[in-house]
Amino acid sequence: MSTILIAIIALAALAAVFGAILGFASIRFKVEADPIVDQIDSILPQTQCGQCGYPGCRPYAEAIANGDQINKCPPGGQATIEKLADLMGVEAEESAHDLDSKVKTVAFIHEDMCIGCTKCIQACPVDAIVGGTKALHTVIKDECTGCDLCVAPCPTDCIEMIPVETTTESWKWKLNAIPVVNITDAANAANVTDSIK
């Protein structure tokens, strides 16, 4: 047998042994999670922005499962509150944040002031800032949630939160506001009024 063939067989055997050990360990030491926390976490927007007062969406989901309010997530908006209310079987509350008057903002980096320290990149929970050490940084506008966690760590104050320009794509279209009348209900109402006459 050649040396290469022996090395391949030995590596394959080691891989099989370590794979079996990892497989056994994943079954033996499996952590059982609360299924309601997983369901709540799947409803939350996963921006990890911290605007709810928790360090991310998973800790907030755990807090909701333990009885905290369901209306603390600004990126999720009223739609998320309603989904959480349906899941938890509680009344849908108004958002704890003023969502209507708050204009959506995104971070903007003044590149002439940026020193490339990467502190904003480290603070961004959604990786919306790109750049490198001692290089210019920029914000990916479509990824930015407007949480403004990147503003405070900047030593040169080169980050500004600017309002997002309203376009046809970002306009709050009320597409579900079209009233739909159930024909059978209308017909029954007409029969009732006819029988009263």
Curated annotation (Swiss-Prot):
Oligomer and partners: The complex is composed of six subunits: RnfA, RnfB, RnfC, RnfD, RnfE and RnfG.
Keyword Metal-binding set for record: yes
Pfam families, alphabetized: Fer4_21, FeS
EC number of this enzyme: 7.-.-.-
Cofactor remark from the record: Binds 3 [4Fe-4S] clusters.
Residues annotated as domain 4Fe-4S ferredoxin-type: 105-134, 135-164
Family under the similarity heading: Belongs to the 4Fe4S bacterial-type ferredoxin family. RnfB subfamily.
Gene Ontology MF annotations: 4 iron, 4 sulfur cluster binding; electron transfer activity; metal ion binding
Keywords associated with the record: 4Fe-4S, Cell inner membrane, Cell membrane, Electron transport, Iron, Iron-sulfur, Membrane, Metal-binding, Repeat, Translocase, Transport
Protein's gene: rnfB
Function (record text): Part of a membrane-bound complex that couples electron transfer with translocation of ions across the membrane.
Name recorded for this polypeptide: Ion-translocating oxidoreductase complex subunit B
Entry's Gene Ontology BP terms: electron transport chain
Gene Ontology cellular-component terms listed: plasma membrane
Recorded superkingdom: Bacteria
Residues noted as binding [4Fe-4S] cluster 1 in the record, renumbered to the chain: 49, 52, 57, 73
PROSITE patterns: 4FE4S, 4FE4S_FER_1, 4FE4S_FER_2
Region (Hydrophobic): 1-26
Chain positions recorded as [4Fe-4S] cluster 2 binding sites: 114, 117, 120, 154
InterPro entries the record matches: 4Fe-4S_dom, 4Fe4S_Fe-S-bd, 4Fe4S_Fe_S_CS, 4Fe4S_Ferredoxin_RnfB, Elect_transpt_cplx_RnfB/RsxB, RnfB/RsxB_Proteobac
Domain 4Fe-4S: 32-90
Cofactor needs: [4Fe-4S] cluster
